[in-house]
Amino acid sequence: MLNIKWIRENKELFDEKLSQRFIEPMSSKIAMLDGKKRKITSLIQEFQHARKVKSKILGNMASKSGEEFEGLQRDVKHINEKLEALEQELNNNNELNELLNMFPNIPDEEVPYGMDESMNKLVRTYGETNPNALNKQHFELGIKLNLMDFEQTAKISGTRFVTLKGDLAKLERALINFMIDVHTKEWDFFEISPPVLVRDNAMYNAGQLPKFAEESFATTNGYRLIPTAEVSLVNMVADTIIPREKLPIRYVAYTPCFRSEAGSSGKDTRGMIRLHQFGKVELVSITTPEESTNEHEYITNASETILQKLNLPYRVMLLCTGDMGFAAKKTYDIEIWLPGQKQYREIASCSNCGDFQARRMKARYKEFGSNETTLVHTLNASGLPIGRTMVAILENYQNEDGSITIPDVLINYMGGLQKIIAYSE
């Protein structure tokens, strides 16, 4: 959520930043709604003060009867009625909060202006892409290996699901353990095993609700399946005040994730690129406003390390204003090279959300010896999605005979297995 005080004091800049997100100017409407809310709040405070004064006089009166006493009683009763009506009006006046809840985060000054991914800015590349490399797509390879099943799975769960078998299931498990080990041992992240069912308020805190309600799966009794472990991890500090010396806090978690893929009809209908259920290792950092820029580079580099150790070619893109996620003020996308598609595809998003999520969930910190609190900054990064990493390994490590060479760093995690070959039932 955006800071209403900042909007109040920076109307023109607010409208300019909204325009960078391709949203029409809204400062005038917000000023009107904010003024109305502040007027009601001011009246409530005045009546509360008047009630306090009159109640004190009543309490100090020697005689608890008579015209003066009864007149004061009537005044207090009238004030209570006014207060009840004003408080009801304030509670019913949700338009301002509803409007603020629909605004995305304000873009950082370094974010390039642009409408879509064509305007994203290349930051760096890693590894070489070979235009003459073997170029079967991952699902062709997986099906031929008899270790990736879409057909039978569709009978169980429908489309956009997959069943991995044998050594591909083992590769999935190996990647999870490898990624968690790298992030905990080399990058100082603390491992968490969080719930994957959360309440709506947790989704709201993370910026998933109300705007993206249709993109998650909801149960019939008030829970939602997480679209990313970011939801569970950032809420670890909801409604808390953290001592400054404990920051940064860095969490890593592997969880299954669930997305309805609303609006993705016709996109990536084959294979493992876009599934309703997928596994992902997620990174979350909680830090101070002064350190969040450096922490953004840190968390991005942690994600990149996984691909570097797997020797997979990738590039890092700085997203433009029109391509950034709702809660982010600045985002790097890491895109992996897929020979089967002959293009780079997103494998990770690494975002600095500033105090956007913290304001929603009241996550604060304070200096030692001080009573003053400040909103933390939250950051998140994919570290990485297991399925898309497997896709990249299958396509970049494929051999002429259809077998898959295991990357060196995964051999021990695979129990010494160096190559995945076709499974014969």
Curated annotation (Swiss-Prot):
The reaction(s) this protein catalyses: tRNA(Ser) + L-serine + ATP = L-seryl-tRNA(Ser) + AMP + diphosphate + H(+); tRNA(Sec) + L-serine + ATP = L-seryl-tRNA(Sec) + AMP + diphosphate + H(+)
GO-annotated molecular function: ATP binding; serine-tRNA ligase activity
GO biological-process terms attached to the record: selenocysteine biosynthetic process; seryl-tRNA aminoacylation
Record's keyword terms, sorted: Aminoacyl-tRNA synthetase, ATP-binding, Cytoplasm, Ligase, Nucleotide-binding, Protein biosynthesis
EC number(s) given by UniProt: 6.1.1.11
Binding site for L-serine: T228, A229, E230, E282, S382
SUPFAM superfamilies referenced in this protein's UniProt entry, alphabetically: Class II aaRS and biotin synthetases, tRNA-binding arm
Main location: cytoplasm
Places the protein is found: Cytoplasm
UniProt record similarity statement: Belongs to the class-II aminoacyl-tRNA synthetase family. Type-1 seryl-tRNA synthetase subfamily.
Name assigned to this protein: Serine--tRNA ligase
Organism of derivation: Rickettsia africae (strain ESF-5)
Gene name of the encoded protein: serS
